[in-house]
Curated annotation (Swiss-Prot):
Domain tRNA-binding intervals: 580-682
Residues that hold ATP according to the record: 334
UniProt protein name: Methionine--tRNA ligase
Motif ('HIGH' region): 15-25
Keywords: Aminoacyl-tRNA synthetase, ATP-binding, Cytoplasm, Ligase, Metal-binding, Nucleotide-binding, Protein biosynthesis, RNA-binding, tRNA-binding, Zinc
Enzyme class: ligase
UniProt-listed NCBIfam families: metG, metG_C_term, PRK00133.1
Record organism: Haemophilus influenzae (strain ATCC 51907 / DSM 11121 / KW20 / Rd)
PROSITE patterns: AA_TRNA_LIGASE_I, TRBD
Gene name per UniProt: metG
Length: 682
């Protein structure tokens, strides 16, 4: 531990003010909160801020649909988000909104500096325009077929199947996600940030060790494909900040969103007298860390540091990215009851259970985390209830009844105590590097040793023997001491359990007093510290989630306005001739092997038998089949004469046919019994 406290500012990605907080959000906020709480225990000067991302077309459209103003919508969202984060014991020093005076001023200041320094350009561009809604369509409000891999139902800016990025103008068969109509092309003047001007700086920053290796490697790919000018403006109607000196032009949400980190901190500084420039000025010696999801790495590792550099502010010390949350091996699903909102979870389960489970599986890499519901129950009960809390309860009773709550005046096993406290720096190193899984593994190994000590000493046997009161007190006091050390290590993960432990121990759990035993100390009466997690609680969460989804669907069916036609039955495609159809060679194929592609959220990899040879095919149906191995041995229908397509994860040699609207609503087509691999579909 350094003698001078570190100065640290930590942020989480800003949740969008157009929806509820769910367990995917909570992964990041729990990860960051654990790190922040650890730094506080180490005596560092740390500030932890966040805000709602409160601008953009989706908010404008949703408010209109609900018959309220965007301001009313984001105010309710902010209140809900603050409630949910507090419910999970996320210890923000400030939670603000990008729709704030601080953010408006900082956004204008940064834009004007970039413009004055020659980094803002303007040009007339062609855009997709919804003639029915009389509005230009943002990238995410256009859907169509990917121009690269031909995957259908993809957004206007990137493909979730092949991970390509492109312009909405490049989409095949585009349609408005607002009205369902075919958009037209219109011209408009837009403002662009000159990102290529910062390529040299960004390459140097990438090599500085400021980024996770996965991010640094990804940035090299982006450099190789050439950086592009970044469109930072949007046309009215739009909910956001108007660009200074440009009528009916607004800042794109992704320009003012990261500035929201600064604005939230500025709001905290104004309230508590903190020096804003000490953390944000160019040359600042404070540390700045952003915790984000892997889906927004592009913005945080390219645009954001370039904006800061171009406007005279410091760059982040590091950007920590994490993966997505899956549930029972599949993408979170509303219909299956696994797209769990934070509020739904809190209605039934202690938030510390999720904090512990996430910590036990989190590491410093960009990997998806699977929230396995059965394993969740087992791990919480085994580790926290049966091992950790039981260590305290099995010793506290003897101390209370036989010794009036007073601990022994000396340690029964000094070497064991030294072994436990000697792990403090290793555990601290794991916390520092965000390798929480190693932290938990180390702590639980010590917990097992503590319980083994009690099992071997058997205080319940000693208690029955006359003249062994001192030995009984010493053994049980040792058990309580080991519990205190373990709870000190776990305090960043389980803050509320730590509070209850502090009440029982009548002592504060601090990192700097881990080595100081509570000799001759008096305990408070022991009360239950933690409750078992029951399967029925999980079932209640799943059922409530399903009910919320069903109610939302019912409400959507009743509304007259249909903001999207994407969920309706797709219209019949353009008529083709029999000759066109004859070009397709569809075959029955037997699934020899099926497995998930770990790096993709959508893809399964199939090895197919076509009778006289085998093929590899990638299919974007991962969300619909969370146990891909169960598809092995099944017969499917595939287009066999489709040209092989080179994808990020290998070559796909055909297309497997399925029906549905996408996501988890996809169903493989199959054939009646009696077919054999390679049969042609007539």
């Amino acid at each position: 531990m350094t003698t001078q406290p570190r100065k640290i500012l930590v942020t989480c990605a800003l949740p969008y003010a157009n929806g509820a907080i769910h367990l995917g959000h909570m992964l990041e906020h729990i990860q960051a909160d654990i790190w922040v709480r650890f730094q506080r225990m180490r005596g560092n000067k740390i500030h932890f801020v966040c805000a709602d991302d409160a601008h953009g077309t989706p908010i404008m459209l949703n408010a209109d649909k609900l018959g309220i103003t965007p301001e009313e919508l984001i105010a309710k969202a902010k209140a809900d988000h603050i409630r949910d984060f507090a419910g999970f014991n996320i210890s923000f020093d400030n939670y603000h909104s990008t729709h704030s005076e601080e953010n408006k001023q900082l956004t204008a200041e940064i834009y004007n500096k970039l413009k004055a320094n020659g980094f803002i350009k303007s040009k007339v561009i062609s855009q997709l325009f919804d003639p029915e809604k009389n509005m230009f369509l943002p990238d995410r409000f256009v859907k169509g077929t990917c121009p690269k891999c031909k995957a259908e139902d993809q957004y206007g800016d990137n493909c979730e199947v092949c991970a390509s990025t492109y312009s909405p103008m490049d989409l095949i068969n585009p349609r408005s996600a607002v009205s369902g109509t075919t958009p037209i092309v219109k011209e408009s003047e837009h403002f662009f940030f000159d990102l290529p001007a910062f390529e040299g700086m960004l390459k140097e920053w990438t090599r500085s060790g400021s980024l996770q290796s996965e991010i640094a490697n990804k940035m090299q790919e982006w450099f190789e494909s050439d950086l592009q000018q970044w469109d930072i403006s949007r046309d009215a109607p739009y909910f956001g900040f108007e660009i200074p000196g440009a009528k009916d032009k607004f800042f794109y949400v992704w320009l003012d969103a990261p500035i929201g980190y600064m604005a939230s901190f500025k709001n905290l500084c104004n309230r508590e007298g903190i020096d804003f420039n000490e953390f944000w000025a160019e040359g600042s010696d404070a540390e700045l860390y952003h915790f984000i999801g892997k889906d927004i790495v592009y913005f945080h590792s390219l645009f954001w540091p370039a904006m800061l550099e171009g406007s005279g502010y410091r760059k982040p010390t590091n950007v920590f990215a994490h993966g997505y949350v899956t549930v029972d091996g599949a993408k979170m699903s509303k219909s299956r009851g696994t797209f769990i909102q934070a509020s739904t979870y809190l209605n039934h389960i202690d938030p510390e259970c999720l904090r512990y489970y996430y910590a036990a599986k989190l590491n410093d890499r960009i990997e998806d985390l699977d929230f396995n519901l059965e394993d969740f129950v087992q791990r919480v009960n085994t580790d926290i209830v049966n091992k950790l809390v039981n260590l305290a309860s099995r010793n506290a009773g003897f101390i209370a009844k036989r010794f009036e709550g007073k601990l022994a005046d000396k340690l029964e096993d000094k070497s064991l105590f030294a072994e436990f406290t000697a792990q403090a720096e290793q555990i601290a190193a794991y916390y520092e590097s965000r390798e929480y899984n190693k932290t938990i593994r180390e702590i639980m190994a010590l917990t097992d040793k503590a319980n083994k000590y009690i099992d071997e000493k058997a205080p319940w046997v000693i208690a029955k023997e006359e003249g062994k009161e001192a030995e009984l007190q010493a053994v049980c006091s040792m058990g309580i001491e080991l519990f205190r050390v373990l709870m000190s290590y776990l305090k960043p993960v389980l803050p509320k359990l730590a509070e209850r432990a502090e009440t029982f121990l009548q002592a504060e759990l601090r990192w700097d007093n881990i080595h100081q035993p509570l000799l001759g100390h008096t305990l408070a009466p022991f009360k239950a510290l933690f409750s078992r997690l029951e399967k029925k609680q999980i079932d209640a969460v799943v059922e409530e989630t399903k009910a919320l989804f069903a109610a939302a669907n019912k409400a959507a069916e009743k509304t007259e306005a249909k903001p999207t036609a994407l969920s309706a039955v797709e219209p019949i495609a353009e008529t083709i001739t029999i000759d066109d159809f004859a070009k397709l060679d569809m075959r029955v194929a037997k699934v020899l092997k099926c497995e998930a592609v770990p790096e993709s959220n959508k893809l399964l990899r199939f090895e197919l038998d076509l009778g006289d040879h085998t093929r590899q095919v990638f299919s974007g149906i991962k969300a619909a089949y969370n146990k891909p191995e169960e598809l092995e041995g099944r017969f499917v229908i595939m287009v066999a004469n489709l040209a092989p397509r080179k994808m990020k994860f290998g070559v796909s040699e055909g297309m497997i046919l399925s029906a549905g609207t996408g996501g988890s609503d996809l169903f493989l087509l199959s054939a009646d019994s009696g077919v054999t691999a390679g049969m042609q579909v007539k």
